[in-house]
Design a protein with these regions (language model features):
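Alpha-helical support elements that line or immediately flank enzyme active sites
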Residues: 23-53, 89-109, 191-260, 317-329, ...
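Helix-loop-helix junctions that connect adjacent transmembrane helices in secondary transporters/permeases
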Residues: 128-222, 393-481
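Beta-strand segments within the central parallel beta-sheet cores of soluble alpha/beta enzyme folds
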Residues: 53, 227-234, 261-271, 298-303, ...
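Flexible, low-hydrophobicity surface segments
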Residues: 1-143, 171-174, 249, 456
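Glycine-rich loop/linker segments at domain edges
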Residues: 1-4, 66, 140-191, 282-370, ...
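Flexible hinge/switch segments at interdomain interfaces of large molecular machines
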Residues: 10-19, 165, 184-189, 339-350, ...
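Phosphate/diphosphate-binding loops
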Residues: 86, 92-94, 258-309
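Short, surface-exposed loop/turn segments at secondary-structure boundaries that line and modulate
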Residues: 51-85, 119-131, 209, 213, ...
């Protein structure tokens, strides 16, 4: 139906009396707000209201909870902390009037020096970015070392690992940075909120990858019981983790609908999506390996400086503020390991989204495979041979890593051997040697990737108390047809087709007789 143009997205939904909202955004990465003058905008025909943090404060709605246990300004409160941060919300009869009115709102800023380098965020003379929590000594996950510090998280045996490094025959160390990236889904973020004041219920349509989490956040923020918050995610044009969290646009549309009693829609444009919604990666990883002269890895040590931007809005499990980064021993049998992660604030848009649901696994693998290559270079050893020497062997499964992961099965040597044969690895190395002898450059990349399937039991994996698992309810009608209601939400992959095919195979009902419902907190 998507290729036939029959998708139903948030912006396709029109409700009677619906208003539209648009944001006044900061041109500065760091600045104090001295004054906001919305008088000219309010005089424009069709403009209903202009909301600022001053309007939200009496309602205790000027800050919203993030999925990481932090709070984020819905509208900049006295200070802006990243370029294009939301400063005011204009509500008008349609989006075009709202966009025109945005240009009429005048904001007087006092520009402040920004911190955009994570390595400088905790300097002794670094300016305090989050003045709203400057006196808060205890973070959501650990004590705070500095006003711009978010958390410290460690896993593994530090003393044992340090002892291995002290006695190691060979060590290597490298700073490996994974730059900030943006998921950039085809459809930008959007929300349509409709408050029913008679029933005391609110219905919210939005680009939500995790509708149930959104319901929880809306309930926490508004005080409306979860049972009266109905969240619906229609078709979504791509997510990649960008649509897991809650954004100020959602909250402003919801608040406006509650106050005005009419439906209010917000749809961001491409520039807003690329500059103000959640980014990913931005990890600066100092990795070390200890090994024997023959290439047997004996220890891994890593420190990560995680740039989370102005607000910690990650969607990582509560117990794992660095996500699943501690999978960083990968496919290798490394006896000892220790990892420490420090999250910091900078004057950037919130970061740390689980881009493509990696939960930091991508960063972990990148760091590990790079440092293994560095070790291979130091030992003058073939990278494939070094990996073969250190793989977890088939007879070692089930295997528990030095950082606590339980591996159920695998045959990594056989997998790599098959891959090397498929690409003609030996021939490629000979070709590389010949070209280098002629002064030509030719590189051969090699990496292994151990992925986690399933987030884990809910006692270990939750976000804001919402367990990271999903369920499916299947009902068989007397006519022989079926309906399946799921907690998951596809983002353009047409999961409903796949789910129907799986059920058809298992139950023995034709897939065309199976109705799939997803993305609705009422089902």
């Amino acid at each position: 139906r998507f290729i036939q143009g029959r998708g139903n997205y948030v912006d396709d939904i029109k409700l009677p009396g619906m208003l539209s909202g648009d944001f006044v955004r900061s041109p500065y990465a760091h600045a104090r707000i001295k004054a906001i003058d919305a008088s000219a905008a309010l005089e424009l025909p069709g403009v209903i209201a202009v909301l600022t943090a001053a309007d939200l404060k009496p309602l205790n709605l000027h800050y919203m909870p993030t999925l990481a246990g932090d709070v984020q300004a819905v509208l900049a409160d006295e200070k802006v902390l990243f370029q294009n941060q939301e400063v005011a919300f204009v509500i008008a009869e349609d989006r075009y009037i709202a966009a025109d009115a945005v240009e009429l709102v005048e904001v007087d800023y006092e520009e402040l020096p920004p911190i955009v380098d994570a390595f400088k965020s905790m300097d002794d003379d670094a300016i305090c970015l989050r003045e709203d929590i400057k006196d808060k000594l205890e973070g959501a996950h650990s004590p705070r070392k500095h006003v711009n510090h978010i958390f410290n998280w460690e896993v593994g045996e530090k003393a044992a690992t340090d002892a291995v490094f002290a006695q190691a025959e060979v060590t290597v160390k490298e700073l490996i940075s994974y730059q900030r990236v943006h998921p950039a889904p085809l459809e930008t973020c959007a929300c349509l909120a409709a408050m029913d004041k008679v029933k005391g219920e609110i219905t919210i349509y939005g680009t939500f990858q995790a509708p149930h989490v959104v319901r929880t956040v809306v309930s926490l923020l508004s005080g409306i019981p979860e049972a009266k918050v109905h969240v619906i995610a229609p078709d979504i044009g791509g997510g990649f983790g960008n649509k897991v969290g809650v954004y100020p646009g959602y909250v402003c549309a919801i608040v406006a609908s509650i106050v005005l009693g009419v439906p209010v829609k917000w749809v961001e444009d491409r520039i807003e999506n690329l500059t103000a919604t959640a980014f990913a990666r931005d990890y600066h990883m100092t990795a070390e390996l200890a090994a024997t002269k023959e290439g047997r890895i004996t220890g891994l040590r890593a420190h990560v400086l995680a740039d989370h931007g102005a607000f910690d809005a990650c969607a990582d499990p509560t117990k794992f503020p660095a996500g699943f980064f501690h999978i960083c021993t990968g496919s290798y049998d490394i006896p000892t390991a220790h990892v420490a992660v420090d999250g910091v604030y900078t004057n950037k848009a919130p970061g740390g989204v689980a881009y493509r649901c990696s939960f930091r696994v991508t960063e972990a693998v990148y760091m590990l495979e790079r440092i293994v290559d560095v070790l291979a270079q130091k030992l003058n050893m073939d990278p494939a041979a070094l990996r073969m020497k250190n793989f977890i062997q088939p007879e070692q499964f089930p295997y528990t890593s030095a950082l606590g992961w339980e591996y159920d099965s695998g045959n990594y040597p056989a997998a790599l051997k098959q891959g090397l044969q498929a690409v003609g690895y030996d021939a490629l190395r000979r070709e590389q040697a010949e070209k280098r002898a002629r002064g030509e450059l030719m590189g051969i990349g090699l990496a292994t990737f151990t992925e986690i399937v399933g987030a884990g039991p809910s006692r270990n994996c939750d976000i804001l108390g919402v367990a990271m698992f999903d369920s499916c309810e299947i009902r068989i009608h007397p006519t022989g047809s079926a309906i399946a209601r799921l907690g998951t939400k596809s983002q353009g992959q047409a999961h409903e087709t796949t789910y129907a095919q799986i059920l058809a195979t298992e139950v023995g009902i034709p897939s065309e007789d199976i109705q799939i419902e997803e993305g609705d907190t009422r089902t």
